[in-house]
């Protein structure tokens, strides 16, 4: 009987926000320790995600969370930075998978193992759901920490997304080093303020 493939699920969080790094996670689930309630992180409440993240870290065969910085996003563009974060997450796994199943329609070019793209994989594949939860909770934690440093921007509430509150805060208080300079609203503010950073 052939050996069962060791599959890592891979997903990202934070492609759309105007601030903060983009995060990715890779998870190899343990078939002997199924985790109930895994679903795409976007359909779970914050409390559910936090609870599941603890279980995933405890019961998965292996997991890794990685990121690509704001500087890397601005240098490479968000797509390439996301692929870089995903590659780092797979490379960082303490157990090498036979296959990486990636949420979405493309596989990172420099992945260290064979990859398979699965559209809406975060809703179809348990390991990808687990990865989406770890990536999202790690990213949210970074934005909560950023909120503690700059409470006037409301990062803990909008998590860096271009909400009316966030855009108003940029207009009132300016652009921070944590903002992505190549993203439309940030770029526009910098252009109208001669590139000033606060």
Swiss-Prot record:
Species classification: Bacteria, Pseudomonadati, Pseudomonadota, Betaproteobacteria, Neisseriales
GO MF, one example: RNA-DNA hybrid ribonuclease activity
Domain RNase H type-2, residue spans: 5-195
Superkingdom field: Bacteria
GO annotation (BP), single: mismatch repair
The protein's name: Ribonuclease HII
Co-factor(s): Mn(2+); Mg(2+)
Transmembrane segments: none
Gene3D superfamilies linked to this entry: Ribonuclease H-like superfamily/Ribonuclease H
Pfam families according to UniProt: RNase_HII
Protein task: Endonuclease that specifically degrades the RNA of RNA-DNA hybrids.
UniProt keyword annotations, A-Z: Cytoplasm, Endonuclease, Hydrolase, Manganese, Metal-binding, Nuclease
Compartmental location: Cytoplasm
Positions contributing to a divalent metal cation binding: 11-12, 103
Catalytic activity: Endonucleolytic cleavage to 5'-phosphomonoester
């Amino acid at each position: 009987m052939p050996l069962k493939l060791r599959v890592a699920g891979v997903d990202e969080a934070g492609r759309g926000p105007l601030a903060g790094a983009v995060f990715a996670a890779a998870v190899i689930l343990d078939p002997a320790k199924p985790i109930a309630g895994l679903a795409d992180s976007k359909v779970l409440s914050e409390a559910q995600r936090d609870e599941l993240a603890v279980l995933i870290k405890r019961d998965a065969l292996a997991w890794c969370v990685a990121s690509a910085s704001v500087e890397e996003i601005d240098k490479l563009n968000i797509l390439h930075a996301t692929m870089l974060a995903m590659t780092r997450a797979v490379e960082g796994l303490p157990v090498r998978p036979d296959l990486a199943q990636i949420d979405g329609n493309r596989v990172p070019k420099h992945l260290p193992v064979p990859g398979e793209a699965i559209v809406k994989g975060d809703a179809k594949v348990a390991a990808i759901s687990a990865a989406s939860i770890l990536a999202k909770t790690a990213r949210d934690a970074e934005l909560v920490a950023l909120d503690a440093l700059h409470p006037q921007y409301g990062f803990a509430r909008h998590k860096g997304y271009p909400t009316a509150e966030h855009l108003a805060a940029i207009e009132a208080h300016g652009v921070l080093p944590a903002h992505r300079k190549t993203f439309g609203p940030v770029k526009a503010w910098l252009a109208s303020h001669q590139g000033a950073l606060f």
